[in-house]
Amino acid sequence: MSGPVDRFAIPCFEGILSSDEKKERKSDFENSEDERRTRIGSLKKKAINASTKFKHSLKKKRRKSDVRVSSVSIEDVRDVEELQAVDEFRQALVMEELLPHKHDDYHMMLRFLKARKFDIEKAKHMWADMIQWRKEFGTDTIIQDFQFEEIDEVLKYYPHGYHSVDKEGRPVYIERLGKVDPNKLMQVTTLDRYIRYHVKEFERSFMLKFPACTIAAKKYIDSSTTILDVQGVGLKNFTKSARELITRLQKIDGDNYPETLHQMFIINAGPGFRLLWSTVKSFLDPKTTSKIHVLGCKYQSKLLEIIDSSELPEFLGGACTCADQGGCMLSDKGPWKNPEIVKMVLHGGAHRAKQVVKVLNSDGKVIAYAKPSYPWIKGSDTSTAESGSEAEDIVVSPKAVKSYSHLRLTPVREEAKVGSGETSFAGSFAGYDEYVPMVDKAVDATWKVKPTAINRAPSKGAHMPPNVPKDHESFSARVLVTFMAFVMAILTFFRTVSNRVVTKQLPPPPSQPQIEGSAAAEEADLLNSVLKKLTELEEKIGALQSKPSEMPYEKEELLNAAVCRVDALEAELIATKKALYEALMRQEELLAYIDRQEAAQHQKKNKRKQMFCF
């Protein structure tokens, strides 16, 4: 026999064992093997149960801590043209190594593009200057490094600050410029310290105020509403130090924090200010002027259209007094003062909350819609990987898939982080990049991977779905499924790239040549008209250049004669002035002589009267 019994049979030196003894020993051995397998199986079950309980305990703890975060859904509306521009801008920054992880944000890049009217080269130059300025100024650590102890004195001579939010959830910033005393302000602080304080407050807004408003309003917010009270503003407010401060602050804000103003209301503006504004308005960009509203003394109704009465200070026509906090200008009232919201912000609630991303076309219609569970999913984080099973459905209209199959959403807090050395399904799509857009699957029409393939390829550290076996005997099956999913991912990636390349190379539809032909004709007509005007301009310049640079002889003679005539007139004027002066002097002398004669005659009359009386 060649079975396991023969291998484990005990050799007998006394002779050949009988068949009964062999059967008895065989049955004893089989019983011991069954017992050993039973014990091993029970140990495996206990180990698996213990591991499962441990994982579930971790999941429960994380769910308890994230219960508030997961309940917040933030709406993020994006325009498809802006989306494409930001994606192109992001790729340019990545190629130039100008995109730190901290600033890899869709809305931040969009603000810089808007500031440069979507000129990518100008926006890239502006972005590079901003990165360099942050390094030189120490902006990344200014909140921890800089302490502004004189803030109370500064607020006394320069009343300003945030107070609550408008009806759309944006923070409201108020300045009472008429109460500013620049001289006393510069006595309690310095220009450089105030500028550092200003930058610190801007950084605090992006770290606390804007995220808190985002959570409270349940939509993305990165701009504010400003109210400037110019009552009493005069030349005394615009000293040299004040002008220098305003110039430096405007440069810092415009260069490094662009497009953070949603709208501005200038109230208590007098007739002179409004006349000046109507003149200055013609030199500004129409988009900028549309944000600025100059109001007179009857501004209350306009402000109440934007801000609720309970959120507007009493001195601006609202009902809020903040009496228990020293007044509205000192209260710093807003969602950023809510302990629950602040706790969520400090624990990354604004970044880890569910984001509802809507992509709109030029007509304002939703063409793509996605609800990523958590923006950041780390492959090595068990608790965050758990959220992958909670991902909500993604809906894309057929029209959007047909028209925008090449569109890719740039990662904006909705990315899957793939750790080095980890096997991840999402990681196969971007081996060159650490972050993979989660929404690309919703917009890309070539995404054909079945849900079962996704569910069978969990990343490292992620919990297994219920349909995946967890016992030891299914290990080979899991390895096979993971390998198949990996291969499918690679094939899908290459098919996506090839489809995009083919899409770009496909000939346009039949109606496209007509459109392109008309556009080309219009461009040709425009070019011809420009060339014609340019030719006329060159002819005029040539005619001007052909004229002699010296003055003609006749005109020069006339000019000399005019100069001589002016000289003669000046001489005559001098002589006339001299004669007039002499005449005046003669007149004074005559008047004095007449006065003397009158006095003499008066004395003679008095003497005659006296003699007659005697």
Swiss-Prot record:
Q: Which UniProt keywords apply?
A: Cell membrane, Coiled coil, Golgi apparatus, Membrane, Protein transport, Transport
Q: Where is the composition biased (Basic and acidic residues)?
A: 19-38
CRAL-TRIO domain spans which residues? 150-324
Identify the GO cellular component terms for this protein.
Golgi membrane; plasma membrane
Question: What is the predominant subcellular site recorded for this chain?
Answer: Golgi
**Single GO biological process annotation from the record:** protein transport
What Pfam families does the entry give? CRAL_TRIO (PF00650), CRAL_TRIO_N (PF03765)
Q: Localized where?
A: Golgi apparatus membrane; Cell membrane
Return the protein name: Phosphatidylinositol/phosphatidylcholine transfer protein SFH6
The species this protein was found in: Arabidopsis thaliana
Taxonomy of origin reads: Eukaryota, Viridiplantae, Streptophyta, Embryophyta, Tracheophyta
